[in-house]
Every structure is written in structure tokens, then in C-alpha cells.
């Protein structure tokens, strides 16, 4: 697990590149440990942005050594269809389409009209408290 102070340092380094830290995940895929950073930027994330963030973060991780053993660092954009986990994610996605799943297996789709610290509102629907949401993500209608 990444400590709070290390995560704050990572966030500051990402911001120094003109980007924002969207999410940070520690996963295991095919027996490999992966530290995956998702970054966003107002005008979109480029490959150069990802490389710059990776180059800045790597020395910090070498010193802080937040993970036991070998791991791979991956830096990318969360993509057009991205998970919504925090109020800031919903606020950043105003006007976008979202699919929200509830614990009772029901789901709803719609355009995000408003979001605050406690709930999200889809166009034509009542506000939905985050506590009722099991999983949510933006989606693009192709």
C-alpha cells in the first residue's frame, strides 16, 4: 500500500508537469506487481506527458520504496470511458454520459448534470448519494 505522504509527493510531482493525478492503483497482473498512475490534463494527456511524469516519479519511488519487491510503473490517461470514484471525478465529468450501478444490481445511465461532495445528479433524475453507488464510469456512445 502506498503511504499518504508518498501519495502526496506523487501528486505534487504530477502537478509540476501540468497534469493532475486522477487515480493510483496497485495491482497484480500475471504474477507482476504494477503501480499504475492515471493522469489527466485540461487539453488531454500525451505520450510525452506520461513519459515526463514517469521520469519524475521513478526516482521518488526508488527513495521512498513504497512497495516490497519488484514492480512496474505505468503512467497513462484514464481514457474516455473511465471509472468515477471520487466527487472530483464526477465534477470533472459534468456534461458527460455515465453508467451507475447500484448494490441491488440495478443501473442507470445519463448525462451528469451536477455533482457535489455528497451526490451526483443525472439529467432528468433525482440526486444520487455516492453511498448508494457501487460502481460508476463514464461512457461514450459510439
Curated annotation (Swiss-Prot):
It is found in: Cytoplasm. Coiled coil: none annotated. Pfam families: DUF150_C (PF17384), RimP_N (PF02576). InterPro entries: Ribosome_maturation_RimP, RimP_C, RimP_C_sf, RimP_N, RimP_N_sf. The keyword Cell membrane does not apply. One of its GO terms (cellular component) is cytosol. Belongs to the RimP family. HAMAP family: RimP. This is Ribosome maturation factor RimP. It comes from Wolinella succinogenes (strain ATCC 29543 / DSM 1740 / CCUG 13145 / JCM 31913 / LMG 7466 / NCTC 11488 / FDC 602W). The gene is rimP.
